[in-house]
């Protein structure tokens, strides 16, 4: 894999260049200095080889900013792991003392280095290129990331230095979701219409060879980045005790037991009244987008604090988007005199959505139960990727109906003729009944809880669809 690191002092347009190269808005772009704090990873496609772009935070070694030592460490780590380095400057400012200091350190690494003179929006700006050679870097390209100007020249220069052959990307065939065959039972046709059958009803949206996208969601300062760093045994995300340290959604690809995981570390959701600037607002909205993008969500809460209304709000967002999820109760090492099973029992009683969730008590600091995260993710993914056999669904419901008979309404009783596991995304069962008017909310909840317990659907938001049907006569 070819790795390209983008480096430079604050506010020279590194994130704008990163987004142009990756052709998507991954990094938060704003005129405020220090917007990017962690290393961000993006992917370039169509080069014929895997290419990864690393966006680093703005380097300012002399700054008294509380985060600068962390940002500098992250930027240096990005430079060390990269094959090609891009030093970005603001051509309108010329070569500053800090630019020269950064260039000196990068030249010391003896790696291919390109000086990217950004914000060359006019011809007058481009004419200043001759002033830049005094920095000691022979490869110089002028660009305007915000106007998508000369990005192609920069790409060509990178390919030349990396000996990447030019390839013509063939048009990709449009992908369609594969239908997962259902099990055939002769009696099924009594309830399914001519344009409706089990084979076409059930489908999976997941693709086996793609990494599982795992979003870590939670309020600021609950330990999301600490969990990722503990899992990966590497400091990839800046950690501090000041709430809101992570602002960008950070994509981190990781392999464990021959399975790939793409962890999305998100900025913490905040109360809207505390969102004081556009950066915080963008970060909050990105958290919601990360939920939509994820295959599985990990909601991180703090064991030392009571469950807040915003923890419940986040869980509500996850559940409404029908995302499989696990609640990670972090900082369990700080809890004394409480049995774990009692804590989980009491936690389930605090909220409807939590009562339906899978819960793990962990500690990023001591690494307690961290490996259970992977096994729980795999178990949850297997559940939502597998079809529940139709005979099993029907036997489970038959036993439930036998155990608790539906109540009689106007001389009639609810009858469930047949049921199938209809779809995986969202997870849904289809039940054929005699009349919806005979289905009470209480009995619907009873059937749903029965299926949840029988098929271990804790952490899997699912629906029951009811369809009125009478047996077909020939």
Curated annotation (Swiss-Prot):
Q: Which GO terms describe its molecular function?
A: GTP binding; ribosome binding
Ranges for domain KH-like come to 386-470
- Tell me the Gene Ontology biological-process terms attached to this UniProt entry: ribosome biogenesis
Residue span(s) of domain EngA-type G: 2-166, 212-385
Binding, GTP 1: 8-15, 55-59, 118-121
- The residues listed in the UniProt record as binding GTP 2, with positions renumbered to this chain, are 218-225, 265-269, 330-333
The alphabetical list of record keywords is:
GTP-binding, Nucleotide-binding, Repeat, Ribosome biogenesis
In which domain of life is the source organism classified?
A: Bacteria
Pfam families found in the cross-reference section: KH_dom-like, MMR_HSR1
Enumerate the NCBIfam families for this protein. Answer: GTPase_EngA, small_GTP
Function, please? GTPase that plays an essential role in the late steps of ribosome biogenesis.
Homology family: Belongs to the TRAFAC class TrmE-Era-EngA-EngB-Septin-like GTPase superfamily. EngA (Der) GTPase family.
> How is the quaternary structure described?
Associates with the 50S ribosomal subunit.
Could you identify this protein by its name? Answer: GTPase Der
Species assigned in the record: Chlamydia abortus (strain DSM 27085 / S26/3) (Chlamydophila abortus)
